[in-house]
């Protein structure tokens, strides 16, 4: 593993000593390969968790590990690149760095909307519209976890909901979910996960 990467991960443990951060860092160190779906997923999750804990600079540094990787046809790998781009986009939007926001969005669009032939692009656009209308939410899963009193499971589903909302926010908004509503929903999930971060174990 690159020395700078190792230093970054060690710095994260100092800033965020909670078990979930130690777990993600251990996963990254165990098999540090950008061709590994598991490594990429752990990097994406670590980036999102850092944003949740208001560690924006560290989140950007983690995102920078993979945000320049090109799409090679494996969506299981690239969905994690997409994930860190959405975190970057939100941070840059808060800072008023609009050109960087545009770059993040274009990178996502080039793969999710405009990659492949016309038939694939049509399918991609249909899926995109469903996502932007909230059809990818995890509200039922969250409710079931609440009803069963399973806090750890609720945190997990809320984390996935949080990442879904970040994607929608990075891609703009829709009639059903304008920017103001998305920002409010993102903040709600962010606060809940941060409050219960010691119980997170996914």
What are these regions (language model features)?
Residues 74, 96, 116, 130, ...:
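Short coil/turn linking the two alpha-helices of tandem helical-hairpin repeats
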Residues 102-114, 166, 180-194:
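TPR/TPR-like (Sel1-like) alpha-helical repeat modules
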Residues 29-37, 68-78, 113-120, 146-152:
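Flexible helix-coil transition and linker loops at the boundaries of alpha-helical arrays
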Residues 12-26, 52-65, 99-106, 131-139, ...:
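Helix-turn-helix repeat elements of alpha-solenoid scaffolds
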Residues 6, 10, 45, 80-87, ...:
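"A position-specific structural signal for the A-helix of alpha-solenoid helical repeats
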Residues 1-41, 45-46, 51, 149, ...:
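N-terminal alpha-helical interaction modules that lie
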């Amino acid at each position: 593993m690159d020395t700078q990467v190792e230093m970054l991960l060690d710095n994260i443990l100092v800033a965020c000593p909670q078990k979930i951060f130690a777990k993600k860092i251990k996963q990254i160190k165990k098999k540090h390969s950008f061709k590994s779906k598991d490594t990429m997923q752990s990097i994406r999750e670590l980036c999102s968790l850092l944003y949740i804990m208001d560690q924006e600079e560290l989140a950007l540094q983690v995102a920078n590990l993979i945000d320049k990787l090109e799409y090679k046809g494996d969506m299981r790998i690239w969905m994690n690149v997409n994930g860190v781009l959405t975190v970057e986009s939100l941070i840059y939007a808060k800072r008023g760095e609009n050109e960087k926001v545009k770059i993040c969005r274009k990178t996502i669009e080039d793969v999710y909307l405009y990659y492949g032939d016309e038939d694939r692009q049509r399918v991609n656009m249909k899926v995109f519209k469903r996502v932007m209308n909230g059809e990818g939410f995890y509200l039922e899963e969250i409710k079931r976890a609440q009803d069963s009193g399973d806090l750890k499971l609720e945190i997990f589903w809320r984390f996935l909901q949080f990442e879904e909302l970040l994607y929608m926010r990075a891609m703009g908004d829709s009639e059903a979910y304008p920017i103001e509503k998305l920002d409010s929903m993102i903040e709600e999930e962010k606060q809940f996960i941060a409050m219960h971060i010691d119980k997170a174990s996914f």
